[in-house]
Amino acid sequence: MIRKIPSFIEVYKSLIQIPTISSNNKLLDQSNKNFIDLLSNYFSDLNFSVKNYQIPHTDKYNMLACVGSGNGGLLLSGHSDTVDFDEKKWTKDPFKLTETNNKFYGLGAVDMKGFFALILEVISSINIKKINKPIYILATANEETDMSGARNFIQSTIIKPDCIIIGEPTSLKLINAHKGHMSYSIKVIGDTGHSSNPDHGVNSIEIMHDVIRSLLILKKYFKEEYQHPNFSIPYPTMNLSSIHGGSAINRICPLCILNFEIRPIPGLTLTQIEIVIKEKLETIMKKWSHRIFIKKLFSSVPAYECPHNSGTIKIVEKLCQLNSAAVNYCTEAPFLQRIAPTLILGPGSIEQAHQPDEYLEHYFIQPTKNIITKLINKFCY
């Protein structure tokens, strides 16, 4: 017999109050085990079979809950972690769900613990004994950093659902494509000396000037050679995000570091970009091979697209009366897409994600429940 879980509000509160911060700063990074354990208990109480998987060499976990058997079905997916927060900028307790002005406030309220609370609310109100195909619920770790949860999941899972829905905050707009993300750091090492005799040193800023010139040529190349009409910015973008070098006005600069990012469009692979970067920097790298060093800052995320001619898109568009679109931010979709056709559709606005006093507006609640119900009815009954 299915045991009743707490109300939507109580579930939502309990999920928000467990810190699950993911950060590249080890002092801020937290385990998500308590959150995963709680979520697992809720789904177990609803007669789901639940398995938790530890991400190797970490204290982070994925959860896969399943009810029903056979091939196909529906996978509803979200990430368990949140970003860090600046306590000085929050006017409310980040770990206490606060309901006011027709909004739910809290860290992860929209990105994306509210989605799990809504899934549980829907599941608790339907007769899962009558389903013909499985319902899967996936909660991943580390989406906000290296996406190791999703990367690990696709390497080990054997499930093949008919459709995957990632409940990221899209304002309930259907997303079928997004750009990828690559980040690099270039370090130029010079030889210092007194500025009164520039020839007795090697100025790293001057070498970096030539590096930047090559990167700007690459930036122009991306804009001219690659286009995707579904994006508001229809070409791969490059951003020279930060540069640091020098210590004193009368000293030849011995070290200069430039960080930059590239956001590729679908159809342009990570490998292709790496090859082009090497080609554009080849001449200057040969000239200064012992002085120029390039490395990745974070794990790259490929661009993603679920093709418009996919039967899954047509089904979901018709079911939800929505047209699919493309966005510029990244999700776990390019990884989950390797398992089954994947779409992004969830409550709340991406504009509220990663912001002080993060919130989910009330008016998304019932429409989201309706959409989840329709998806389950279509793919599982």
Curated annotation (Swiss-Prot):
The keyword Methyltransferase does not apply. GO terms for molecular function: acetylornithine deacetylase activity; zinc ion binding. It is found in: Cytoplasm. InterPro entries: AcOrn-deacetyl, ArgE/DapE_CS, Bact_exopeptidase_dim_dom, Peptidase_M20, Peptidase_M20_dimer, Peptidase_M20A. Its main location: cytoplasm. Its cofactor is Zn(2+); Co(2+); glutathione. Transmembrane segments: none annotated. Catalyzes the hydrolysis of the amide bond of N(2)-acetylated L-amino acids. Cleaves the acetyl group from N-acetyl-L-ornithine to form L-ornithine, an intermediate in L-arginine biosynthesis pathway, and a branchpoint in the synthesis of polyamines. This is Acetylornithine deacetylase. It comes from Buchnera aphidicola subsp. Acyrthosiphon pisum (strain APS) (Acyrthosiphon pisum symbiotic bacterium). The lineage of its organism: Bacteria, Pseudomonadati, Pseudomonadota, Gammaproteobacteria, Enterobacterales.
